[in-house]
From Swiss-Prot:
Segments for region (Disordered): 1-49
Transmembrane portions of the chain: 88-108, 147-167, 180-200, 203-223, 227-247, 276-296, 350-370
Phenotype of gene-disrupted mutants: Lethal during the late embryonic to early larval stages. Hypomorphic mutants are viable but male adults are sterile, whereas female adults remain fertile. Impairs spermatid individualization showing abnormal mitochondria morphology and defects in lipid compositions and lipid-mediated signaling. RNAi-mediated knockdown results in low insulin pathway activity and defective cell growth in certain tissues. Various non-adipose tissues display excessive fat accumulation such as the salivary glands, proventriculus, hind gut, Malpighian tubules and trachea.
GO molecular function list: phosphatidate cytidylyltransferase activity
Lineage: Eukaryota, Metazoa, Ecdysozoa, Arthropoda, Hexapoda
Name of the molecule in the record: Phosphatidate cytidylyltransferase, photoreceptor-specific
One of the Pfam families matching this protein, by short name: CTP_transf_1
Source organism per UniProt: Drosophila melanogaster (Fruit fly)
InterPro entries to which the protein is assigned, alphabetical: PC_trans, PC_Trfase_euk
Keyword Transmembrane among record annotations: yes
Keywords assigned: Endoplasmic reticulum, Lipid biosynthesis, Lipid metabolism, Membrane, Nucleotidyltransferase, Phospholipid biosynthesis, Phospholipid metabolism, Phosphoprotein, Sensory transduction, Transferase, Transmembrane, Transmembrane helix, Vision
Length: 447
């Protein structure tokens, strides 16, 4: 039994009130479970008050649009106004995406890096408000330093992997290739020591929380962008198709939800409906099959990006692999005595489309939960009707990871061109040893 003394007035005596621990717990649980319970300022716990105060300082997403668009749509209801705005900027982004694809792999890699930096800035700005409130030293500088270090490591890994032969031929860059991982580790250790030296008494817990915040942000955006670039080098189709599937699912789920949505899907995103989720899923599978069939006809999209020693440059020409060579499939299983010619990649595209439509949206739900925790509408307002860059790429990062794992598990086979690149990086005597071993082994096999 716990006694709670309550003073009714300044001159009134103390009143002893006995409250059982179990009753108090039940009251707290019922209050927490009540969906319509709203805490008063006095009832709010310190953490809730802190989040409320923090939310006032965070950059809130807005629905601002260009004035010319506002004036043109002023007579429309808000629901249809938002529909038109989202539609216009969706098509603008699709056209921009097409132009970047036309620019080739280098344009895609630069765009990936820029998107990554912007996403990191949007996430870290929330933590930066915590830094400003508490006066924590060096938080923003350390965050950007760790971003630079992480990019040096991951992008360097890609450069060494795909451009190692070219870089090794430049004398002053050879050192960076040979000791890339050691240099990356040394740069990280500098940041680590910098963080330790910046620790301030009273704020240890908060500083370590923000240190973790930065590293989780790096895990979300830098690691995923590294995987995206690996997917690009496997062939543009492994980048374009999954990205387009997420876009298609997002658009079609919005369309089906807008016209037919009645049943709420998840509390984290009240506007999401089962009708939109299911309709978007079917549309994505159909779109994935048709879009994949079109891209499979062009070497530009299906060939992996490799360095050609003969041509002395990176190439996107190849003999199409089994995945992109039409195969004959019998339809007897379905009671039809005919055959169908299909690219094997189409079957893989169905797996990708199912993931993008069933699991992909959970990347968006995760982001919605994060935004609700800090009581913000969007990560930013860079794209009218859509929010910030992170609001558009929350599902893309999850999809990129799946595609990378899918390729390494079910698709990737040893690449002769990549093996040659690694051999060219060896010393002449090591290359000669490999040559002799191959010669002897092949001789034994042929005799």
């Amino acid at each position: 039994m716990a006694e709670v003394r309550r003073r009714k007035g300044e001159d009134e005596p103390l009143e002893d009130t006995a409250i059982s621990g179990s009753d108090a717990a039940n009251k707290r649980n019922s209050a927490a479970d009540s969906s319509d319970h709203v805490d008063s300022e006095e009832e709010k716990i310190p953490e809730e008050k802190f989040v409320d105060e923090l939310a006032k300082n965070l950059p809130q997403g807005t629905d601002k649009t260009p004035e010319i668009l506002d004036s043109a749509l002023k007579d429309l209801p808000d629901r249809w106004k938002n529909w038109v705005i989202r539609g216009i900027f969706t098509w603008i982004m699709i056209c921009g995406f097409a132009l970047i694809i036309y620019g080739g792999p280098l344009a895609l890699m630069i765009t990936t890096l820029l998107v990554q930096v912007k996403c990191f800035q949007e996430i870290i700005s929330i933590g930066y408000q915590v830094y400003r409130i508490h006066g924590l030293p060096w938080f923003r500088s350390l965050s950007w330093y760790f971003l630079l270090t992480s990019n040096y490591f991951f992008y360097g890994e890609n450069l060494v992997d795909y451009f190692g032969v070219v870089i090794n031929r430049v004398e002053y860059l050879k050192f960076l290739v040979t000791y890339h991982r050691f240099l990356s580790f040394a740069l990280y250790i500098i940041g680590f020591v910098w963080f330790v030296l910046s620790l301030v008494k009273k704020y240890y817990i908060k500083q370590f929380s923000l240190f973790a915040w930065t590293h989780v942000s790096l895990l979300i955006v830098v690691t995923q962008s590294y995987l995206i670039i690996q997917n690009i080098f496997e062939g543009l189709i492994w980048f374009i198709v999954p990205v387009s599937m997420i876009v298609c699912n997002d658009v079609m789920a919005y369309v089906f939800g807008f016209f037919f949505g009645r049943t709420p899907l998840i509390k984290l995103s009240p506007k999401k409906t089962w009708e939109g989720f299911i309709g978007g899923g079917f549309a994505t599978v159909l779109f994935g099959i048709l879009f994949s069939y079109v891209l499979c006809n062009y070497q530009y999209f299906i060939c992996p990006i490799q360095y050609s020693e003969e041509q002395g440059r990176m190439t996107m020409s190849c003999v199409p692999s089994y995945l992109f060579t039409p195969q004959e499939y019998s339809l007897k299983l379905f009671g039809i005595g005919k055959t169908l010619n299909l690219y094997p990649f189409i079957w893989h595209s169905i797996s990708l489309s199912l993931f993008s439509s069933i699991i992909g949206p959970f990347g968006g739900f995760f982001a919605s939960g994060f935004k609700r925790a800090f009581k913000i509408k969007d990560f930013g307002d860079m794209i009218p009707g859509h929010g910030g860059i992170m609001d558009r790429f929350d599902c893309q990062f999850l999809m990129a990871t799946f595609v990378n794992v899918y390729i390494s598990s079910f698709i990737r086979t040893p690449s002769p061109a990549k093996l040659l690149t690694q051999i060219y990086n060896l010393k002449p005597d090591q290359q000669y040893q490999i040559y002799q071993s191959l010669k002897d082994n092949l001789g034994d096999m042929l005799t």
